[in-house]
Each structure stands twice: as structure tokens, then as C-alpha cells.
């Protein structure tokens, strides 16, 4: 099993690791597409400041698109011994492109990656919820139109009193 980035030279007790890490790897699968999008933006910036060549950028973007497609289809997996989604993406890139794949983390901390992934994931979820609420709103409006002539007989468990002010 590969050594985790945070282990350094100390072996962590497996019970403590299970308690603190829990289902992180499982939950990271939800972040895979967002991690890839963040990496695409980051490497575009790296190329713009001269840390990647145009050719390296093209190769990385092509492979990141493949990884994104894999995540879209639900086929993206974090292999046993791989710490998290960020490490898995880098591993996939280095397997396919060699040392070019290692360059995606230049000038970016893991905390930056985690924060961006969570923000993108949250934004996507909020958008989906807003769309569902809008659909519900339209259903309720249609129902209210359909039943507008039926008088209300009870409100809050009490007989309804119609007022004509």
C-alpha cells in the first residue's frame, strides 16, 4: 500500500485512521468531476504563466476530459492504497502522460483543491435544488388553478371562516 501524504515517517494506527478518515474516499467520488474541472482551470493558468508548454496543456486537457467522462459515467474509482480523489487524478495522468501528469499540482495546495472541489460541488447541488423547487412551484401553481373553485373547509384543524372585507 502506498504511503499517504500525511503519514510522513510515522505509521498511523489503523483504528484511528478508520475513525478520522471514515468514508472520505467514498465521498471523494462525488467530487471527482469538480476536481477535474478545477485541474483544467489550474493547468490553463499554469500554461499562461509559462510553467506548462502549449503541448503539455493540450495533452493534460485531453486526459482530464477522459477522466471527467469516466466520472460522468460513474466509472471513476479511487484505487486501493490511493489516498483521495486528487491523488487518483494525478496517478491516472502520470500513468498516461508520465512526468507531465505530476505538474498539475504546481503552485496549488491540497487545501486549495479541497476548497475548490467543495465549492463547485455545493454550487452544483444548489443549482439542482433550485431547479427542483422551481418545478415544484409550477406544479403547485397548476394545482391551485385546477382547484381554485373548491372552497377550503378547514385551516389548521379549525373550520374555515370565509371573510369578505
Where are these regions (language model features)?
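A helix-coil-helix interface module used to build multimeric assemblies
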Residues: 1-158
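A short, hydrophobic C-terminal helix/tail in secreted or cell-surface proteins
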Residues: 159-165
